[in-house]
Amino acid sequence: VRAPAATAAHAQQLLDQVNQFLEHPVPPALERALRTVPRHLFLPDRIWRGDGQGGYDLCDRTAEPERWLEEAYTDTSLVTQFTDGLPTSSASMPSMVLRTLQLAGLHAPSRPLSAAEMGTATGFNAALLCALLGDQAVTTIELDAALAERGERNLHAAGYTPKLVRGDAAVAWQHNAPYDLILATFSVDRIPPAWRAQSAPGGRIITPWNSAWCCYGTLALTAHHDGSAQGRFHPFASYMPMRRPHPALATPQPATTDHPTLLTATSTLSPWAVAGGDLDAEFHVGLTVPGASFSWDTTGDHAPVRLEVADTTGPSCATVDYDGHHSDRFTVAQSGPRQLWDEITAAYDRWQTLGRPRVDQHGLTVDATGNHTPWVEAAGRRHTVRARPGTSAESQP
């Protein structure tokens, strides 16, 4: 017997909050799934909620059972695991989960579908998929052994029995393949080849997106017969990045090679324009300047405000200083084989030229060999955007 929700009132409270956040009622099929799957059964005794200041507040069910249950049925993300002081697993915000499921078309499937979830975590998302598609149609994959065990225990306690696999979500798993839907619960900066290989023609690949510059957005791809996939980004969700089992397969770290040559110049591009919270601009920079990351230094040791830019794939770096007086020119220092600030400036200029496109005007084509080509739709044309300066945008009808 499937376990009921804590109370009907708790489920209604969560549904009301989700509807309010999404600004529209969720489709009936998704509403039934949310009412059916008891979120509290998928949470550990100790959960952490963001405190709005970069930290986390602990809620322990043993000490505060009523508050813990209230948190379980609040439309918010909850950290469920820390590793070396950093959050490494969470229960996603329910409204984001339902928005993703709606994007995948699961609110009104026209035929039976098979789905692979990449990242079981608590098991809550897998349970929603089971409620929508049936247990036998769902495969869920988890790399972390402890999370896999916990997710399996949670799913069984709630009465759901999808196919559970312990392993790397970036490699091929044949159970139920090819899939009509591949749904990731973590963010990626490239589409693993196995996801395209395991997608049925016309199948959907839905994944949160990240770049070294901007961890934001959800990519919805459609797979094609020739092994390629194409789709558009959507302006919601910021998820933890994919974890890999071997360091050699992880995201490359900056090289240690010293590049003493330091080029200094003056720039009219404000660092706040590309790293000050404009998600449309930051998304474009992140998508088209691969490997570039940033951090702010406001200690005053070098300048009142300094933007530090680094290349996560090599030794290049740059700094942009605000002297506290002039907001129309900034001192730039660059070193390494890439002139990072020049690349970022070119990307920002292109974004301006294209009419400051929103996140949802951006898209991605992944060809059968795995090449990733980002593009922007603006002024009725599709523009293939280039990462390096000095290369003009190519337009396609």
Regions from the PLM with identified roles:
Residues 59, 231-237, 315-324:
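Short amphipathic beta-strand/extended segments with alternating polar/hydrophobic composition
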Residues 40, 48, 168-170, 211, ...:
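Short, solvent-exposed coil/turn elements at secondary-structure transition points
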Residues 2-116, 125, 132, 151, ...:
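Class I SAM-dependent transferase core
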Residues 312-397:
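C-terminal target-recognition/interaction regions appended to catalytic cores
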Residues 88-206, 211-213:
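Conserved nucleotide-cofactor-binding alpha/beta core module
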Residues 25, 30-31, 85-97, 210, ...:
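Hydrophobic alpha-helical segments that drive targeting, anchoring, or assembly
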Residues 306, 311:
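C-terminal catalytic lobe of FAD-dependent flavoproteins
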